[in-house]
Swiss-Prot record:
Belongs to the RecR family. May play a role in DNA repair. It seems to be involved in an RecBC-independent recombinational process of DNA repair. It may act with RecF and RecO. Residues 82-177 form the Toprim domain. SUPFAM superfamilies: Recombination protein RecR. The keyword DNA damage applies. GO terms for biological process: DNA recombination; DNA repair. The gene is recR. This is Recombination protein RecR. The keyword RNA-binding does not apply. InterPro entries: DNA_Rcmb_RecR (IPR000093), Rcmb_RecR (IPR023627), Rcmb_RecR_Znf (IPR015967), TOPRIM_dom (IPR006171), TOPRIM_RecR (IPR034137). It comes from Rickettsia massiliae (strain Mtu5). Pfam families: RecR_C (PF21175), RecR_HhH (PF21176), RecR_ZnF (PF02132), Toprim_4 (PF13662). GO terms for molecular function: DNA binding; zinc ion binding. It comes from the Bacteria. CDD domains: TOPRIM_recR.
Length: 201
């Protein structure tokens, strides 16, 4: 095997190691698994990634990831359209969906605010949220940001921003440890946090 090929394989391993939850050892295992049967495994993965890249878009209403401009959640007639859960990223949206206990709508912020940084709050898509609250006659807004310092900072900022709207504002409750992120919690814990949510002021 020549030096160029070595570098190419090292680059593949490096790219895998940058994926969440994967270290260098796991990245090497994945690369080896794909390369040992590249005509089937590697090409199949590449073809799927190319197709996904063509089809995946952000929902123009909530910011979810889907294959349609309006995602399946926003377009569903079975969702409770009087409740919106505010999440930091699509990962938290998926965590709440896995719990099977939330039947409302979502608003994906895409970011959070850090008390130590000077981030512009406009990154949170809050004008769009407020517009939705008025246009869709939202009765309750559930702030489902993570229990990290950044998540708490973001939650307080959202509460202040939504003061002009009469919707009830609540926060996910017990079971979410300080510093915890929804995506890493089991479905039962997320369900309990949704059911036991508290008013947030």
């Amino acid at each position: 095997m020549n030096e160029t090929n070595d570098n190419d394989i090292d680059q593949l391993i490096y790219l895998f190691s940058k994926l969440p939850g994967l270290g260098s050892r796991s990245a090497r295992r994945i690369a080896l698994y794909l390369l040992q049967d590249k005509d089937v495994r590697l090409k199949s993965l590449i073809n799927n990634l190319v197709e996904i890249d063509k089809k995946i878009v952000k929902c123009k209403i909530c910011g979810n990831i889907d294959t349609e401009n309006i995602c399946r959640i926003c377009s569903s007639e079975y969702r409770d359209k009087s409740i919106i859960a505010i999440v930091e990223t699509v990962a938290e949206l998926w965590a709440m969906e896995r719990s099977g206990n939330f039947k409302g709508l979502y608003h994906v912020l895409g970011h959070n605010l850090s008390a130590a940084s000077r981030q512009n709050p406009s990154i949170l898509r809050l004008p769009e949220l407020l517009k939705r609250c008025f246009a869709e006659n939202i009765k309750e807004v559930i702030i489902a940001t993570n229990s990290t310092l950044e998540g708490q900072t973001t939650a307080y900022f959202i509460t202040e921003y939504l003061k002009e709207h009469p919707a009830k504002i609540s926060r996910l409750a017990s079971g979410i440890p300080i510093g915890g992120e929804l995506d890493y919690l089991d479905e039962g814990t997320v369900s309990a946090a949704i059911n036991l949510r508290q008013p947030f002021e």
